[in-house]
Each structure stands twice: as C-alpha cells, then as structure tokens.
Swiss-Prot record:
Keywords tagged on the record: Apoptosis, Calmodulin-binding, Cell membrane, Disulfide bond, Glycoprotein, Lipoprotein, Membrane, Palmitate, Phosphoprotein, Receptor, Repeat, Signal, Transmembrane, Transmembrane helix
Signal peptide positions (record): 1-25
Region (Interaction with CALM): 226-250
SUPFAM superfamilies the record matches: DEATH domain (SSF47986), TNF receptor-like (SSF57586)
Principal location listed in the UniProt entry: membrane
Source organism (scientific name): Macaca fascicularis
Domain notes: Contains a death domain involved in the binding of FADD, and maybe to other cytosolic adapter proteins.
PANTHER family according to UniProt: TUMOR NECROSIS FACTOR RECEPTOR SUPERFAMILY MEMBER 6 (PTHR46874:SF1)
InterPro entries xref list: DEATH-like_dom_sf, Death_dom, Fas_rcpt, TNFR/NGFR_Cys_rich_reg, TNFRSF6_death, TNFRSF6_N
Residues listed as glycosylation sites in the UniProt record: 118
Modified residues (Phosphothreonine): 211, 318
Subcellular location: Cell membrane; Membrane raft
TNFR-Cys repeats: 47-83, 84-127, 128-166
Protein name in UniProt: Tumor necrosis factor receptor superfamily member 6
Length: 331
C-alpha cells in the first residue's frame, strides 16, 4: 500500500508533462494558421486597392478594360453594371472590379516631354522626349536638353543618349597649326622688307635716285652731326631718343640727370640726350651708327628722312664749293 502512494506523484507528473506538450503543439499550429490567414487577407486587401477583386457584394465577372463599375452588385454572383471611362482623360488597361478609372498621364513640356501616343480608354498616354532632348533612364519622368557642341560633333543626340562633342584641342588641327607657325616668320620678314623699301623710295630725293660719279661721291662716315642735332631731335619722339641713346652707351644715370635738368622742356631733353651720345661716340661713323640704329628699331622712314636731310645739305655745300673753285680757276 505504501508503494502505491510512492508511485502516484510520479504518474501525475508524467500526465502533466504530456498535457503541456499537447497544448503547446495546438497553440503553435493555431499561430501558424493565423499567420497564413493574415497573409492571405493582406494580399486580398492589396489587390482590392488595384480594383482586381470584389468590392461589396461579389460580382460574377470584372468590368472589361476601358470600363468601370457603375454600382455595386446587389446580389452575389450578379453581373456588374459597367460604363466606359472618359475618352482622353481616363483609362483601364485590364479587367477589374473598381468603380473608378485611372487618370491619363500628362506629358509635361516643361520637363522636355511630348505625346507619342494619345491616351485611350484602354491605354495610358505614352510620352517621349521632345526634339533636342534625351533621357537615358528606364522610366523617364523628365528629359534633359542635348549638349550643344562648340568644336564639332562626334555623335548626334538621340532620344536615349546625349551628344558626344569634339574636344577643343583636337589633334586633327595640329598639322595645320604647325604649318601656320612655320609660314608666319618668312611672311612677316617679307612684309617688313617691302615696307622699308617703299618708304625709302617715297622719301628719296631726285639727287638720291642718280648714281654719284667718283668725283661727286660723298662719304657720310665723317660727317659732323653737331649742326644737325637739333633737326634730328625735332624729327624724333622723346621715347625714340631715349631708346636710341640707351642702346648706344648713354647710362641711365645720365638720362635721368638730363631729364631732371629739363623737366618742363622735352625738346631740350632730346637735344641734350643726342649731344651727350655724340660726345661719347665721337665724329667718326656717328652718322652711320645713327642711321643703322634707327633702322634696327624699325624706324626706317625716320632714318631715311634724316639721311636725306644730311645728304641734301652736304651735296649743296659740295656744289657751292665746286662752284667757288671753278670761279677762282677762271680768275
């Protein structure tokens, strides 16, 4: 009898454990079924938002594309009362149970779009990019303007790709550029040479156009320029005088000294600068140095004028001297 009372608690514990397992299994099964039910309900609700399933009473068939349900079915499995969508403004492209049509899409010109296919009751509007616009995405909500090329086009703009432009420093122009750079120096040289020759001819006096015979030939290398300094200074600007004397030995300190001594008289500055140069250089070859220096500074016209003045004066003196000599020989 004592053994029975000892085994009874063990039996009761085993029974409780078995009952607990059964209850847990049922709860788990119920939870799993509840989850599946919620999933089905969610799917139905989502589809109802698209109008693919029944609203209100269950109609037997959906409204065809291009129409909508005018009113709910009053009896389950009844045929729906469908009416057409508004042409050009609304559409439905599949069978449905909804009482509303979808609104047609608008092609916004401000976003570079235009209508490719108009909206019908069974098809939404189809948009495309306007001319000179493109869109390279799968769904085009807007189009971008095509790039305008300044230096030539490699590929034209299309509806799905932008223009491909040539670069500014295209290598195709390099040979022409090199040829141009090679031709410029000789052309400039010829132009300058012709200009100097033209000025020389325009300023040449009648006495210069004839060739002097050995008896009347004049050597300008030993001409005394002191009496021509004022005339030469009057034919030149102050900057021209400064450039000439600076390149021919007059120091900057001396140039500044002459400037400070004659601040208000630029004419006197030119005369003093040329006198100072002449004193430094000396009489011999001074005339040739002056003429060559002016030509080197691209002052061909000025050089020819000074040369003509000196030559005319010397020629006149020579003729007078010859005339006097002839008179004396006759006496």
């Amino acid at each position: 009898m004592l053994g029975i009372w000892t085994l009874l608690p063990l039996v009761l514990t085993s029974v409780v454990r078995l009952l607990s397992k059964c209850v847990n299994a049922q709860v788990t099964d119920i939870s799993s079924k509840g989850f599946e039910l919620r999933k089905i309900v969610t799917t139905i609700e989502t589809q109802n938002l698209e109008g693919l399933h029944h609203e209100g009473q269950f109609c037997r068939n959906p409204c065809p594309p291009g129409e909508r349900k005018a009113r709910d079915c009053t009896v389950n499995e009844d045929e729906p009362d469908c009416v057409p969508c508004q042409e050009g403004k609304e559409y439905t492209d599949k069978g449905h149970f909804s009482s509303k049509c979808r609104r047609c899409r608008l092609c916004d010109e401000g976003h570079g779009l235009e209508v490719e296919i108009n909206c019908t009751r069974t098809q939404n509007t189809k948009c495309r990019c306007k001319p000179n616009f493109f869109c390279n995405s799968a769904v085009c909500e807007h189009c971008d303007p095509c790039t305008k090329c300044e230096h030539g086009i490699i590929e034209e703009c299309t509806l799905t790709s932008n223009t491909k432009c040539k670069e500014e420093d295209s290598r195709s122009d390099l040979p022409w550029l090199c040829l141009l750079l090679l031709l410029i120096p000789p052309i400039v040289y010829v132009v300058i040479k012709k200009a100097c020759r033209k000025h020389r001819k325009e300023n040449q006096g009648p006495h210069e156009s004839t060739t002097l015979n050995p008896e009347t030939a004049i050597n300008l290398s030993d001409v005394d320029l002191s009496k021509y300094i004022t005339t030469i200074a009057g034919a030149m600007t102050l900057s021209q005088v400064k450039d000439f004397v600076r390149k021919n030995g007059v120091s900057e300190a001396k140039i500044d000294e002459i400037k400070n001594d004659n601040v208000q008289d630029t004419a006197e500055q030119k005369v003093q600068l040329l006198r100072n140069w002449y004193q430094l250089h000396g009489k011999k070859d001074a005339c040739d140095t002056l003429i060559k220096g002016l030509k080197t500074a691209d002052l061909c016209t000025l050089a020819e004028k000074i040369h003509a003045v000196i030559l005319k004066d010397i020629t006149s003196d020579t003729e007078n001297s010859n005339f006097r000599n002839e008179i004396q020989s006759l006496v």
